[in-house]
Amino acid sequence: MKSISENLKVSLTCLDGPKYKLSELEEYYIKLQENKEFNVNLVGIKSTKNWSFDKDFNFVHDSKKFFSIKRVKYNKTENGIIHQPDVGVLGVLTTQIEGVLHILVQFKEEPGNTNKAQLSPTIQATKSNYSKAHGGSLPPYWEKFLSIPKNNFIVDSLQPEQGLRYWQKFNQNVIAETDFIEEKQGFKWMTLGQVLAFTKFDNSINSCL
């Protein structure tokens, strides 16, 4: 059995892996950027549903869930800051494919991205996501993470978010080993070398990965 350092070294130097060649992943990524069905339009604050300013001029949701935008003052500067006290989860699944370490990456399309899709963790969820406060479905692979034994967790650590944008926000950062599982739409098993190679594309890798 390889040590962790040996697994990392092999994965970092593997560009054409047993699952995908790097060129196949690049082609997939480029096609996502050309997705004409994913369109984003800026709207005025007054056009948002169920959001409003409270008596203290914080921007909040009627349900008091999700997050709020509060005012902070520091160094004679007054800014808006995101207040989201619930702990989020940033999780990455790993597996061995023909002896090479792979991580399950989501090519995630989000409205605020400079590019349409970014390489992101397997799970990137707030409490509102995994408690289905928005009325939608659970994040992909959420139940898989819950079923993984604790001794399969390589990393399980509480870490802070960006303090310039979030007020005392924390995420549970998890890396867990699993048997090979099939990819859902928008997910790819990638070697660490393949992920690193994507840095040649500007704005391609989500900061949470």
Q: Residues of each region from the PLM?
A:
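Short amphipathic alpha-helical surface micro-motifs
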Residues: 50-51, 86-88, 156-158
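N-terminal domain-onset segments
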Residues: 1-75, 208-209
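Mixed-charge (acidic/basic) macromolecular-recognition segments
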Residues: 1-26, 101, 111-209
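Aromatic- and glycine-enriched beta-alpha-beta binding-site module
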Residues: 65-131
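Sparse, context-dependent recognition of short Cys/His-centered cofactor- or disulfide-binding micro-motifs
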Residues: 54, 77-79, 160
